[in-house]
Amino acid sequence: MEVKVLNKDGAETGETVELKPVIFEIEPNDHAIYLDVRSIMANQHQGTHKVKTRSEVSGGGRKPYRQKGTGNARRGSSRSPVMIGGGAIFGPKPHDYVVGINKKMKRLARISALSYKAKNNEIIVMEDYVPSEIKTKEVVSFLKSLGLNEKKTLLLMPSKNDVMYKSGRNISKLSILEANKASTYDLLNNKTLLIQKSALETLERSLGVA
């Protein structure tokens, strides 16, 4: 699939690049996408939730009052779960939420996501561009020129660039990532995929396509 390369003003540069069929034209595997997104979302849990049981709360070392004669219910300890300040019954404990997925399936999921984007004409390739200085206005301007100022957009860069990142971090509908670090969730959670020309090569290498 050949696509035209646009400049930051939204005009055609006269160049075209090939979106390789092995990445952008496969039959998407929905189950692989499901497994990868489930793994990504699950692994975001810290799993540090914890409450104290009756053996961990403070106090309650002795019987709070005598067994008979007070008119109250029998109490052996103020740590009892039915008492205010007592321990919790079956409360949450630290838990590892990690859901594993093998590299082959993760790669298939990313390629499936990219193929969906290509199929729906949601990929734009632009020339390599970085603002001359940290300036949000410049990034807003080129997004507007490309017709992306109102669309949730993922911009893929060939490598980490602080000037571009800091210029775009205040734009609510724009995410900026290095091409080799974009996950299946990142690709599908944005309406448009804006790829810089050099980033396309980085993306292909990260997927094992030279």
Swiss-Prot record:
Q: Which UniProt keywords apply?
A: Ribonucleoprotein, Ribosomal protein, RNA-binding, rRNA-binding
InterPro entries according to UniProt: Ribosomal_uL4 (IPR002136), Ribosomal_uL4-like (IPR013005), Ribosomal_uL4_dom_sf (IPR023574)
Cellular component GO terms, alphabetical: ribonucleoprotein complex; ribosome
Please cite one Gene Ontology biological process associated with this protein. translation
Region ranges (Disordered) = 44-79
Under Pfam families, the record lists: Ribosomal_L4
Q: Which domain of life is it from?
A: Bacteria
By its UniProt entry, which SUPFAM superfamilies does this protein fall under? Ribosomal protein L4
| A molecular function (GO) term | structural constituent of ribosome
| Family affiliation | Belongs to the universal ribosomal protein uL4 family.
Function according to Swiss-Prot or TrEMBL:
One of the primary rRNA binding proteins, this protein initially binds near the 5'-end of the 23S rRNA. It is important during the early stages of 50S assembly. It makes multiple contacts with different domains of the 23S rRNA in the assembled 50S subunit and ribosome. Forms part of the polypeptide exit tunnel.
Checking NCBIfam families in the record gives: rplD_bact
State how it assembles. Part of the 50S ribosomal subunit.
HAMAP family hit by this protein: Ribosomal_uL4_B (MF_01328_B)
| Record's protein name | Large ribosomal subunit protein uL4
User: Which gene is annotated as encoding this protein in its UniProt record?
Assistant: rplD
